[in-house]
Amino acid sequence: MGITGNIYGINGPVITIQGNLGYKMNEMVYVGEHRLVGEVIRLSKEKTTIQVYEETSGLKPGEEVAGAGCAISVKLAPGILNNIFDGIERPLQKIAEKSGAFIPTGAQADALDREKLWETHITVQEGDEVAGGSIIAEVPETKSIVHRVMLPPGVSGTVTAVKPDGDYTICDEIVTIRTTDGGTRALTMTQEWPIRKPRPVKDRYPADRPLVTGQRI
């Protein structure tokens, strides 16, 4: 857990804390007794400004604001398809099963099923050199879409151990690598990625025709 402060001002979905206590820009915070999810959007010597991504009715000055110590992130793994999320990757179907059609204040649930087993084909072998974006496994997520599990950006090394093909959860360690700095890293099918940070791409092709859906956006 990161830095803890207290609410000084409330203006709709925006709250402020007096001074700069050491929060970071885009850091995720939990606001009030219901631990509403928010994000640090502005820092100055005089105050810290936070955007709360839930209804702030009932909040009052003096309530605690706890920093998470990391940016607001989403989990990327098999299970995203056929799911419905809100803007901070809360699974709406799962919350509805527990609480009904309306999301209660501070509702929390795992974004993805951590216990579901996925048929997994490992695509690397011991001794392979891998880098960010290398495909280490494939999972048939639907009948028509294969989820390709990639090495996280910024990571590279040599594969030292692999699990055999089989059924695994998104939290099971399936590949181990020796990184270029001499460390060891065990990899699962899950990546956590900051929502404000664009995913890196090797090439970006210019659009030459519109995507026509027939739906009004």
Set out the residue ranges of the language-model regions.
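Short, compositionally biased
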Residues: 42-48, 78-89, 145-165, 184-201
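P-loop NTPase nucleotide-binding/switch module
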Residues: 97-143, 147-152, 169-217
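Generic structural signal for short, solvent-exposed loop/turn connectors between secondary structure elements
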Residues: 32-34, 164-167, 181
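Short alpha-helix capping/helix-loop boundary micro-motifs
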Residues: 13-17, 48-54, 114-125, 158-163
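N-terminal accessory targeting/assembly segments
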Residues: 1-96, 101-104
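Short, surface-exposed secondary-structure boundary micro-motifs
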Residues: 20, 34, 70-71, 89, ...
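Residue-level "contact hotspot" at macromolecular interaction interfaces
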Residues: 22, 58, 123-129, 161-167
